[in-house]
Amino acid sequence: MKLTEKNITLFALTCFVIISTTWLFLNPIQPKEKHIAEIKEGDYVVIKGYIQEMYVKRDKYRHVINISRIVINDGTGNLDVVAFGKTREELLTYILSYNPMIKEGDYIEVKGRVTLYKGKYEIILNNIKDFKLLKKNNFERDIYLSPTPTGIYASKYGKKYHTSKNCPYGKRLKEENIIYFYSEDDAKALGYEKCKWCEEHGG
């Protein structure tokens, strides 16, 4: 092949692309650990902080079946963490793999590119390896509802629970609106108070 200025230029560009690609493969860009107050859009960072809030979807028995957003705080500010598709499914599996599940107060690490969405900074997880529990702080037990009738029940629209099948107030509840608890402690932990009639009549 005759060496011309054009051929030499193309050859040089090809070599540059190959060398650059190889270098990036062998030396991937490393994220920089920062405080939330220091980040800006486009930064590739590692953030460590406490879970402040989790936006989850639960089924009728209170099992978590989806996670839409996690808000973390490191003492300098808040950051939203989101995931989509397969990564969201893997995030849910990871969170539920702990007993009790990962929840508010737990100390975590996230890694990713900072984006801006509706005026808020967020990191979109591209890989479940970019989300890690560093320390479990919240050991409050996970509370679920019973799928079968128990002696402890309430309306899903109220805040009083009943323990007697003869309770005149409990009898007014429509079957489709009744939820059942495994224990009175579960009912109280979810913010329910015992019905006065059941309390007075030993139910």
UniProtKB/Swiss-Prot annotation:
Taxonomic superkingdom: Archaea
Database matches in InterPro entries: Ada-like_dom_sf, NA-bd_OB-fold, NA-bd_OB_tRNA, UCP021980_OB-fold
GO molecular function terms listed in the Swiss-Prot or TrEMBL record: nucleic acid binding
Gene3D superfamilies linked to this entry: DNA Methylphosphotriester Repair Domain, Nucleic acid-binding proteins
Pfam family, one: tRNA_anti-codon
Coiled-coil intervals: none
Protein name: Uncharacterized protein MJ0818
Organism: Methanocaldococcus jannaschii (strain ATCC 43067 / DSM 2661 / JAL-1 / JCM 10045 / NBRC 100440)
